[in-house]
Amino acid sequence: MKCDVRRGKFLSLFTAHYSLFTFLILGWIMTCSISATAYALEWGSKELETEKLAVQFANQVKKGGYGLVTTEELKEWLDKKEPMLIVDTMPLEDSYKKNHIPTALQIEFPVEEMSQLDEAKKAALEELLGPDKSRKIVSYCGFTKCGRSHNAAMWAVKLGYTNVYRQPGGIKAWMEADYPVEKGQ
């Protein structure tokens, strides 16, 4: 009889531990599942944002008719002393005077795409870019999402300049690469 009682206690303990173990395993699986779902949703939303920006950027380049240059390539061009004009399109006081790519000249453009260029801005841009329509011109702004450099490059092409590039990473990528900057005018 004692054996039966012990067996009953053993089965009772085993069942309780088994139930607890099963509960813990199921809890862990659910936690992992929820975490994986949350991660997938978060990762997916970041991927959608990246895709949206990539398509928007590609459309700007296509519409603008200009080339692209990476931050590293621009640094190489500067190191080789290639003849070019670098155009900083950020605000003079808030950005250009604080930090700009060496040799860059400044002309401010708006962030939103410009469908028209008024005569004063057109004259200022043509004066800055000069008479040589084949001159290498590189525009940049603050960072990839900024549209200022797109506007400058697009309008340089519309004005007949044929060797126009945009450095999309802007001053932010330049400084993150730990490249030298100039300050002031």
What are these regions (language model features)?
Residues 1-8, 13, 19-20:
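Short polybasic linear motifs
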Residues 90-92, 142, 179:
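Solvent-exposed coil/turn segments that connect beta secondary-structure elements
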Residues 97-100, 150-152, 177:
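Short, solvent-exposed loop/turn and secondary-structure capping segments
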Residues 122-168, 172-174:
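Catalytic cysteine-centered active loop of the rhodanese-like fold, especially the PTP/DSP P-loop
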Residues 63, 73-137, 184:
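Positively charged, proline/Ser/Thr-rich regional signature most characteristic
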Residues 21-33:
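Bacterial N-terminal signal peptides
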Residues 178-185:
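Active-site neighborhoods of enzymes that stabilize oxyanions during catalysis
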